[in-house]
Swiss-Prot record:
Residues 137-140 are annotated as: G4. Residues 175-177 are annotated as: G5. Keywords: Cytoplasm, Elongation factor, GTP-binding, Hydrolase, Magnesium, Metal-binding, Nucleotide-binding, Protein biosynthesis. Belongs to the TRAFAC class translation factor GTPase superfamily. Classic translation factor GTPase family. EF-Tu/EF-1A subfamily. InterPro entries: EF-Tu_GTP-bd, EF-Tu_GTPase, EFTu-like_2, EFTU_2, G_TR_CS, P-loop_NTPase, Small_GTP-bd, T_Tr_GTP-bd_dom. The gene is tufA. It catalyses: GTP + H2O = GDP + phosphate + H(+). The lineage of its organism: Bacteria, Thermotogati, Deinococcota, Deinococci, Deinococcales. This is Elongation factor Tu. Residues 82-85 are annotated as: G3. Residues 10-215 form the tr-type G domain. Mg(2+) binds at residue 26. It holds the Pfam family GTP_EFTU_D3.
């Protein structure tokens, strides 16, 4: 069947399935595509094995296997990610390769929360996944209603422990496999025909109503990482880069943040593809002409931003994935005092790593939290991604989980 073009009239939301291995994340992803397609024939259905053979992709120098599926409900268009292996989740969430506006936490009702359930919730907290909806899968394998209540309580407590609103967030119970089997035998099944399929609809309703539509990048406060700087004789200094978020207009005041002292200036012109514009918005590659700024006052690695919206920092706590030897990472462990380069947006800055108490060393392949002190300040906020490099090769990826100073 040919892929239909998606109507972009609906708001777009990025979500994904998270949870312990074999609890049914991929089966649920397949069941969701079949459920959505039963009401809308333009949606492509994907069977389990089509999702499970996730293609490799690269993000910040790291290879990750991720399956992307698309579907829509009456009110929204969704991009949904599912990863085959636990390590792929860790890498995906830390690099931000697949940004999630919300996640569906899949828990097997027969097993309850398991180690990776906890680990994925912690990761979601550290990398800033803002909303979680729970799907208690495999309820057909549990006869005891009290046992189901117990598992639900455990999951809610675990979420509360990691600062999610465990008491209030939606928990939907069902069986992804039973729903998938029902839909594979009758793809055009109407809602209300089969209870297992209806549980998937209930989950989609919960996702629709509980996970808010994200603010569009263009509506956020302006920020542009500086990639290059040059002088136009008689007109002044131009900083070029891709607008990361927000909008910038001619005559706007902006701050130049990072590496040295923050300074304010005014935008006197904006160019894109050699044409003059009134404004540049998220996603545009632009040249921004800055008033009264010398060529040496602005450099790659700084950002232009709305005044007061972002501050330069040197010390932060990070959640980090360290590449294994097979992934082209280090061959040996590192210890406290390790001094690699931290690549933020467009530049490398040297920093010193301080490990948490009780952690002797970090091995290639580890997922770890530690503190970093940079030798120069970088425009920083929680959720900012970075790569860790040695001599230009990537040895790790991280996300700022807490700004310290």
């Amino acid at each position: 069947m040919a892929k239909g073009t998606f109507e972009r009239t609906k708001p777009h939301v990025n979500i994904g399935t998270i949870g312990h291995v074999d609890h049914g994340k991929t089966t649920l992803t397949a069941a969701i595509t079949f459920t959505a397609a039963s009401a809308d024939p333009t949606i492509e259905t994907l069977a389990y094995d089509q999702i499970d053979k996730a293609p490799e992709e690269k993000a910040r120098g790291i290879t990750i296997n991720t399956a992307h599926v698309e579907y829509q409900t009456e009110t929204r268009h969704y991009s949904h990610v599912d990863c085959p292996g636990h390590a792929d989740y860790v890498k995906n969430m830390i690099t931000g390769a697949a940004q999630m506006d919300g996640a569906i936490l899949v828990v097997s009702s027969a097993d309850g929360p398991m180690p990776q359930t906890r680990e994925h919730i912690l990761l979601a907290r550290q990398v800033g996944v803002p909303y979680i909806v729970v799907f208690m899968n495999k309820v057909d394998m549990v006869d005891d209603e009290e046992l189901l209540e117990l598992v639900e309580m455990e999951v809610r407590e675990l979420l509360s422990k990691y600062e999610f609103p465990g008491d209030d967030l939606p928990v939907v119970k069902g069986s992804a496999l039973r729903a998938l089997e029902a839909l594979q035998s009758n793809p055009k099944m109407a809602r209300g025909t089969d209870k297992w399929v209806d549980y998937i609809w209930e989950l989609l309703d919960a996702v629709d109503s509980y996970i808010p539509t994200p603010e569009r990048d263009t509506d956020k406060t302006f920020l542009m990482p500086v990639e290059d700087v040059f002088t136009i004789t008689g007109r002044g200094t131009v900083a070029t880069g891709r607008v990361e978020r927000g909008t910038v207009k001619v005559q706007d005041e902006v701050e130049i943040v990072g590496l040295t002292d923050t300074r304010k200036t005014t935008v006197t012109g904006i160019e894109m593809h050699r044409k003059l514009l009134d404004s540049g918005m998220a996603g545009d590659n632009v040249g921004v002409l800055l008033r009264g700024v010398a060529r040496d006052d602005v450099e790659r690695g700084q950002v232009l931003a709305k005044p007061g919206s972002i501050k330069p920092h040197t010390k932060f706590e990070a959640s980090v994935y360290v590449l294994s030897k097979d992934e082209g990472g280090r061959h040996s462990a590192f210890f406290g005092g390790y001094r690699p380069q931290f690549y933020f947006r467009t530049t490398d800055v040297t920093g010193v790593v301080e490990l948490q108490e009780g952690v002797e060393m970090v091995m290639p392949g580890d997922n770890v939290t530690f503190t970093v002190e940079l030798i120069k300040p970088i425009a920083m906020e929680e959720g900012l991604r970075f790569a860790i490099r040695e001599g230009g090769r990537t040895v790790g990826a991280g996300v700022v989980s807490k700004v310290l100073e």
